A protein has these predicted regions:
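Exported/periplasmic ABC-transporter solute-binding proteins
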Residues: 4-295
C-alpha cells in the first residue's frame, strides 16, 4: 500500500468515527431533550362532559370561552362523565391532560403547577391558586322535610365542617354545634360527581348519629342534579359550580366548601408546570403537540 493510500484510509476512518459520534450524540441528545420536555407527540385532551359543574367552572376560570361566554373546548377532546373516569383515562395515556377536583386527586396522576403555584388546600384558601370553585347544595326550601333540614344543619355545623376539612376541602366558618340525634326517614340527593365523595362521608357521619336515616346519593353531574331538585325528583342537589340565574330563581343554595381544580397529566410526564395561557390554548385546540408547549 502506498503512503498516499494509507493517508486516505486514515482520513476515511476518522470521518466515519466522527459521523458515528455525531449520530450517537444527536440521538442521545434528542432523547435527553425529550425527557426534559416531559412528553412528545400529539396532546390527548381529556375533558368532562357538558353539564359537568367541574367543566363549567374550569372553562370559566381559565377563559376557554368566546366573546359571548360560550364554552370553546376543542371538538377533538375526549369526554369523560365522572372524576374517577377522568383520572383513569389520564393514568392510561402518557400524552393525556385533564382536570379533576383537588379533593379527589390521587397519586395515579400528576398535578402540575399553574402559573407557578401548586394546587393545595393552603393555596386555595389563601387565593394564590386561582383555579377554584365552590361546592354547593341547592334545594326548594318549601319542599324540605324536617329530616332534610336536619341533615343540612349537620353539614353546616362544626361537626360537618370538621368532616369537610378532613377530606381535604376548605370548609365554611361554622358557628354552631350539631345537637340532633335519633332521626328517622329518607333523604334523596343528586348531582356533582366531584361533591359526591365528601357528601358520602358526611352522610356516613350523620348516620352514625341517626342510624335510622337512609340517604340516597346519585352521581349525575351538577346540571342534572340541579334539574332533578327543580323538578322535585330529589330533595337536595349537589353542585360544583354557582347556580345560573334561572336556577337561582327556583332553588336556594348554600356553599358547603371551596375546592381547587387540579390540571393533571400522566405520571410519566416530567412536565411540572403550565401557564394559564398554555392551558387555555391546549383545551381550546390551539396547541396540539407537546413540543409546542415545551419549546
Amino acid at each position: 500500500m502506498t503512503k498516499k493510500s494509507i493517508i486516505i484510509s486514515i482520513i476515511s476512518v476518522i470521518c466515519l468515527v466522527g459521523i458515528a459520534a455525531f449520530v450517537m450524540y444527536g440521538c442521545s441528545g434528542g432523547k435527553e431533550n425529550e425527557e426534559k420536555s416531559g412528553a412528545s407527540g400529539q396532546i390527548t385532551v381529556i375533558s368532562r362532559e357538558e353539564g359537568s359543574g367541574t367543566r363549567d367552572a374550569f372553562v370559566e376560570v381559565m377563559g376557554i370561552t368566546d366573546e359571548k361566554g360560550n364554552d370553546i373546548t376543542a371538538d377533538m377532546a375526549e369526554l369523560t362523565n365522572s372524576t374517577s373516569v377522568m383520572m383513569s383515562t389520564v393514568k392510561g395515556n402518557k400524552n393525556a391532560i385533564g382536570y379533576v377536583s383537588l379533593g379527589s386527586l390521587s397519586s395515579d396522576v400528576k398535578a402540575v403547577k399553574l402559573d407557578g403555584v401548586a394546587p393545595s388546600t393552603a393555596t386555595v384558601k389563601d387565593g394564590s391558586y386561582k383555579l377554584q370553585r365552590p361546592f354547593k347544595i341547592a334545594y326548594i326550601n318549601a319542599k324540605l322535610t324536617d329530616i332534610d333540614k336536619d341533615f343540612i344543619s349537620f353539614i353546616m355545623s362544626k361537626q360537618g365542617e370538621a368532616v369537610i376539612a378532613k377530606e381535604g376541602y376548605i370548609s365554611t366558618e361554622a358557628k354552631e354545634d350539631y345537637t340532633g340525634s335519633g332521626k328517622k326517614g329518607t333523604i334523596t340527593i343528586a348531582g356533582s360527581t366531584s361533591v359526591a365523595p365528601v357528601m358520602n362521608v358526611l352522610a356516613d357521619e350523620y348516620k352514625k348519629l341517626n342510624p335510622d336515616v337512609k340517604i340516597e346519593i346519585q352521581e349525575s353531574g351538577s346540571s342534572a342534579g340541579i334539574e332533578s331538585a327543580m323538578q322535585g325528583a330529589v330533595e337536595i342537589a349537589m353542585s360544583s359550580r354557582e347556580l345560573k340565574e334561572d336556577e337561582a330563581k327556583t332553588l336556594k343554595s348554600q356553599t358547603i366548601a371551596l375546592d381547587g381544580i387540579a390540571v393533571i397529566v400522566n405520571s410519566s410526564n416530567t412536565l411540572d408546570a403550565l401557564t394559564s395561557e398554555q392551558v387555555k390554548n391546549i383545551f381550546a385546540g390551539n396547541v396540539s403537540a407537546w413540543e409546542e408547549v415545551t419549546k
